[in-house]
Design a protein with these regions (language model features):
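Extended alpha-helical regions
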Residues: 1-2, 97, 110-113, 177-185
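Residues that form or immediately flank small-molecule/cofactor binding pockets and catalytic motifs
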Residues: 8, 53, 138
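A structural "domain/chain start" motif
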Residues: 18-71, 171-185
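Surface-exposed short loop/turn segments
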Residues: 20-28, 80-130, 137-153
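Extracytoplasmic/secreted envelope proteins and their assembly/folding machinery
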Residues: 66, 70, 74-78, 114, ...
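Compositionally biased, intrinsically disordered linkers/stalks adjacent to structured regions
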Residues: 143-185
Length: 185
């Protein structure tokens, strides 16, 4: 009888754990609204990738992360209406991921991410915006019993927070004062 209780408890935990589905990797920011300070610029190109090794701190991510980040960023930019169609200034937006520190285990799962966002004027090469945006995604232990579920959700939250922080910083940026003047004046 004493043997049956622990075995039953272990089986119950295994069944409950097995029923939990790992959420998809989804970086889409849900609460993006139209910004009040729109830029007189049209985005022509958007790229997202990993920074060169010498710029990276901790990157524990595979090649599936940049395309998902790009898709979520494009969605957030579209919904924020921060860039204008048919504007006189055409720009490229480049994102280089310098940190993706995902938790391997733990009770409270925290993922930290960092990315360098650069907006460049296509006509003259002026660097209109360049910032390292850092963020974290924290998932408490009561979110889910299975650690893998909390870990993936912490990735999602970290990148969502990063994209939202970028849009907030970009809204405050002044494109009339380039950070760096390009060569083609």
């Amino acid at each position: 009888m004493k043997f049956i209780r622990p075995v039953t408890l272990i089986l119950l935990i295994a069944v409950v754990s097995g029923c939990t589905a790992i959420p998809p990797v989804d970086f889409t920011v849900q609460d993006v609204g139209m910004v009040s300070n729109r830029k007189d610029a049209e985005i022509k190109s958007l790229t997202v990738g990993f920074a060169p090794q010498e710029q990276q701190s901790i990157v524990e991510a595979n090649a599936t992360i940049p395309p998902l980040w790009k898709e979520a960023l494009q969605d957030a930019l579209n919904r924020s209406l921060i860039f204008q169609d048919d504007a006189s200034i055409k720009v490229n937006l480049s994102v280089r991921i310098v940190e993706f520190d995902a938790p391997s285990f733990g009770v409270e799962m925290t993922t930290t991410v960092g990315a360098i966002y650069e907006v460049v004027n296509r006509k003259n090469g002026d660097l209109l915006f360049a910032e390292l945006v850092e963020s974290a995604g924290v998932v408490p232990p009561d979110y889910a019993f299975v650690g893998a579920v909390r870990a993936v959700e912490s990735w999602n939250r970290a990148v969502r927070n990063n994209i939202a922080a970028f849009i907030n910083q970009l809204e405050d940026a002044d494109f009339s004062k380039p950070m760096y003047r390009g060569e083609n004046e």
